[in-house]
Amino acid sequence: KIKKHLIGQDEAINTITDAIQRASVGLKDPVKPIGSFLFAGQTGVGKSLSAKILANELTKSSDSLVSIDCSEYSAEHEYAKLIGAPSGYVGFEQGGMLTNAISKNPFSIIVFDEIEKASHKVHELLLQILEEGRLTDGKGNTVSFNEAIVIMTSNVGVNEIDAITKSIGFG
């Protein structure tokens, strides 16, 4: 079904569906996310759209897509919005946008859009999600990501690759 919405992305779709199928039969690390993927390419090739279509086809719910625009997290302190402010700080009671979303709907597609624009603190959170499969929010609650699919998008290096392929006679 996904392939009829996304033309020319068969390899990416097959890779994602293979990961989901492996997870459904228990052939994945029980702690880590179902899969983690880096979609790299020029603006407009369907990186973010792929994630939206995947979320709609898998869950039939828009609540299952957690989209994080990493340009909003370029300042070092902004990462607290994802996991919640520590106790004693303003907004502590609200929790974090990412941890709240995963607590409510563990089977989610999380998109870190333009990951290269995020601060190193967001990269550290992402590493913890991918390595350990969990985060601790500002309230001290542990949130598991073992039923989530993590997608990062980027267009870093695309111009360089285009220049190389054109210089050797392709394109």
Spans of model-derived segments:
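AAA+ P-loop NTPase nucleotide-binding core of proteostasis motors
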Residues: K1-G171
